[in-house]
Structures are given as structure tokens and as C-alpha cells.
Amino acid sequence: AVRALFYYYIMDMYGRVPIVTSYEQPQDEVVQSERSEVFRFIVNELQEVAELLPDERSNKMGNYYGRVTQPVVHFLLAKLALNAEIYCDDNWTDGVPQNGKEIFFTVDGERLNAWQTCIKYCDKLAEVGYRLEDDYSYNFSVHNENSNENIFTIPLDKNLYAAQFWYLFRSRHYNHGGALGGSSENGTSANISTVLANGYGTDDVDARFEKNFYAGIVEVDGKPVMMDNG
């Protein structure tokens, strides 16, 4: 399951990547596979291991904290099905999109299209108690281990992980970090398509936007934080 998870990451980022399943494979035999082939490899691998994994919450303290469990696999399969039109398109510059109704999966013996598959795996998550939280912010609070929405979170328990807030300062702009009296790396940034998708700059901004991003003018002690060039 972990191998499939990391193949998902690189397929999503790069598209065509080599499929290597043995450390003994000679380097000169490592060649790129089409994105659709990598997609099917990931789906098949996740479906094969799903029934072997415990039906436990990965975001709660205990033996399975931070580990890939069955709900994590179901969540990832739902995500793969939801984006199947993209992942099954090997000629993504030809202007001819794929059709999710014509991309099929076998789930519990049923032949389902991509949209039906996504719903099926989301239903599996709902059956074991996952649901959207009434307060979106709670998912990101310090004590969010009882969130009914979080499925696969970064383990940051203060008693187990000394680097628990690194991801916070890594996401801030250098000047924000300095103005707030802390550190920063300017690592995670939103691109134009992200802010537009959230309605930034319009009268219909997604209510979650301000909870996920620093945007616009940020003030500290009543003074705007400026770029180095003003």
C-alpha cells in the first residue's frame, strides 16, 4: 500500500514514470510507462491489499497512528476514480478529454464506471464513521485527533515527534516569518490557478480560503508586511 501511495504521488506530479517492482531490475531495463498504465498498477495494488489491512483510524493514537489502514486505501481509491479522466489520458495535449462514464473498475465484484467507483469508496468511508465536520477549522486544530473528517494525517504528536510544527513555518513567506517573530521557508505556495479556483478576488470566495492561505495584505501590529522591494 505504501508503494502504491508513493507511485500515486509521482504519477500525479509527472505523468509517465517507470514501474519498478524489484530492486534486482537492471537499470537499462527501467523505462517510462504510460500514465494510464501506472494508474492501473496503483489501483490494482490498492485493491489487492485493501482487504488485508485493519479497519482502523490512522489519525488516532495507537498501533495504527500514521499508518496506511483500510480507510486510507479506500480514500485513495476514491481520489483515483474521481480523477480517472486525467490519469487515463495518455495524450493530454490533443484536446480530446476522457469520459469517466467509459472508464471502468471492478469493486466487490461489480463493474462500475469512474463516478460510481468514487461514490462506492466514499460510501465505504461513511459506513465506518467518516463524515464532514460541521466546523472545517476543527480539522486543523491542535487537538484534532477526534476529527470525523481527517483520514490520513501527518503524525505530529508532541510526545513522539519533536519536529511537530515544522510544516507551519515552512509554509510562510520569509517576511511573514520575520514579522511574526518566527522562522519561515516560503516552501508551500499557492499558484494562480489555486487562488482562482477558490474565487480569490471575486465576490464569491470559498469560505475555506482564508483558513488555508495567507492572501492579500497581512498586517502585524497594524503594519503591512512588505516584500523586500516594497
Tell me the role of every PLM-derived stretch.
Residues 1-169:
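Structured, solvent-exposed acidic/aromatic patches
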Residues 121, 126-230:
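Elongated scaffold/linker segments in the mid-to-C-terminal portions of large proteins
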